[in-house]
């Protein structure tokens, strides 16, 4: 039995929105254009629609190989949400091989064909017109051929070729990958109310969840304005926005729903948010288990869901529309009234051991 199979008791430091203790005011005031500070402790009870669609696919696929969700690669449970902070990680490693191969196949192949045509022309003393004609036919011809053959050859390289080449080094590579991922692994911990953000080389920025301010950050990219959840430590203004948890979204309401979901996850007076990734662990969280018992929630709702029908029906008409139409501006912050009620010197004595110095 693993630690994720055991029901838990929450620590005294766990986040409770109804019991936010006095906090010192921040010595620094943050005023940045393109950032919207979000209130803490008032909930809409929504889940991010687009993330939910992806998570349904992920959980249904993962269950086929790990029905107990005990694999270390499943990073969400009733105790903590794990994510990568500022790490390129496995996605880069998976991307760089096919990208390099396709680049070599197309650009390298065209250059080789062009060099070959020139070499043949010089060797046989062909006329410039003939050499140019051959180049005009063969170089674009190779480009078309390269694009046609790129997909099957890339699939073979990623599935068979790279596995054959790396097989003798499999254990070493897996060990190094695990170490790299672990070094960049951060977490929101529901049990003790702490946020631990990896800084690399075994270092972590750790602080209580209540010390983080949430902002909706505007991200200007080609094609328009997008949005992302950004966490800023209230006292030292350390910013965390390029994480595996906060992705860039086209709809602002998706980011607002993500912040709402995260708060309810951390708030131990609330049941776990009803999201796909947390479903296998709901019965292990005491508050959630009692909530589900009273409401009669189907314990396999997400895992047995017909996703396409859901997207055409309840998913769009209820989940998406609710987050889009919710009056987000009506929320009040339960944290703000507690600021300035205690000195920094007094507060430092109350912080958990291991928290980043302020």
Regions found by a protein language model. Give the residues of each.
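Extended, Lys/Arg-enriched charged tracts that mediate electrostatic binding to polyanionic substrates
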Residues: 184-194, 198-201
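Alpha-helical transmembrane spans
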Residues: 82-180, 300-358
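Canonical phosphoinositide-binding patch of PH/PH-like domains
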Residues: 45, 232-295
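Low-complexity, highly charged intrinsically disordered N-terminal segments
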Residues: 53-97, 108-110
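Phosphoinositide-dependent membrane-docking surfaces
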Residues: 194-195, 202-222
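Short aromatic-glycine-enriched beta-strand elements
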Residues: 224-230
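Long, charge-dense tracts
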Residues: 2-5, 9, 112, 353
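Short, non-transmembrane cytosolic segments of multipass membrane proteins
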Residues: 9-72
